[in-house]
Amino acid sequence: MGMRMMFTVFLLVVLATTVVSIPSDRASDGRNAVVHERAPELVVTATTNCCGYNPMTICPPCMCTYSCPPKRKPGRRND
């Protein structure tokens, strides 16, 4: 297959997936709004796990007190 043919197939796939996903967004008609309002309470954040609520996580205690030393940027002089 030539380069032009592969590019045409790629564009057709992108167009097809876009056309298929647009009607499915409209079909929900706001029914997902209840799920999105409830989601933050159900998702456990890394900070909550890290600060002692979940004993199975391994993370430095300085993350809970925000006293971790700043990371050095690679490729720069770190004087």
UniProtKB/Swiss-Prot annotation:
Any one Gene Ontology molecular-function term assigned to this protein's record: toxin activity
Keywords tagged on the record: Amidation, Disulfide bond, Gamma-carboxyglutamic acid, Glycoprotein, Hydroxylation, Ion channel impairing toxin, Neurotoxin, Secreted, Signal, Toxin
PTM summary: O-linked glycan consists of Hex4-HexNAc2 hexasaccharide.
Modification 4-carboxyglutamate occurs at: E41
Modified residues (4-hydroxyproline): P40, P55, P60, P61, P69, P70, P74
Glycosylated position list: T45, T47
Residues that bear Proline amide: P74
Entry function: Probable neurotoxin with ion channel inhibitor activity.
Protein family membership: Belongs to the conotoxin A superfamily.
Entry protein name: Conotoxin MIVA
Organism name: Conus magus
